[in-house]
Amino acid sequence: MIEVKDLHKSFGDTAVLKGISTTFEKGKTNLIIGQSGSGKTVFIKCLLGLITPDEGTISYEGRVYSKLGVEEQRNLRQEMGMVFQGSALFDSMTVEGNVMFPLEMFTKQSRSEMQDRVDFVLERVNLVDAHKKYPAEISGGMQKR
């Protein structure tokens, strides 16, 4: 069994996980669903030990994950099956750069026309405020958009 108690995680001033507590029974299939930007990917990465929560504990069969050795953590991860939402983003480019890239590669539009299209798309998918951020700095749901 996996037990999550009072899990919190923030990135800068943005609180992503706010006191999550739940349990997952061994052998059961569980779904983690929610709105875009609600912290699903961050939560799963905490479960896998890929991100360290700011507060709270994650226990596997009564053993606190953060107190386990690297080998034990690896073995636990191998027992879990995860399906992540995929994205084809360039980590070295900002959100704006990722949207601009196909236009630069496959259109003959002027720079200002391309920028107008990028601005339009970012507004449509509610990512204007994230335009200068890199994929690692935004939620999985935002990456999907």
Where do the protein language model's features map onto the residues?
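The feature captures the beta-strand-to-loop junction immediately N-terminal to the Walker
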Residues: 33-35
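Conserved ABC transporter NBD signature motif
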Residues: 56-65
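Conserved ABC ATPase "signature" region
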Residues: 63-64, 111-130
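ABC ATPase NBD coupling module
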Residues: 65-81, 105, 111
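Short coil-to-helix segment of the ABC ATPase nucleotide-binding domain corresponding to the Q-loop/switch region
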Residues: 92-101
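Conserved ABC ATPase signature
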Residues: 134-138, 142
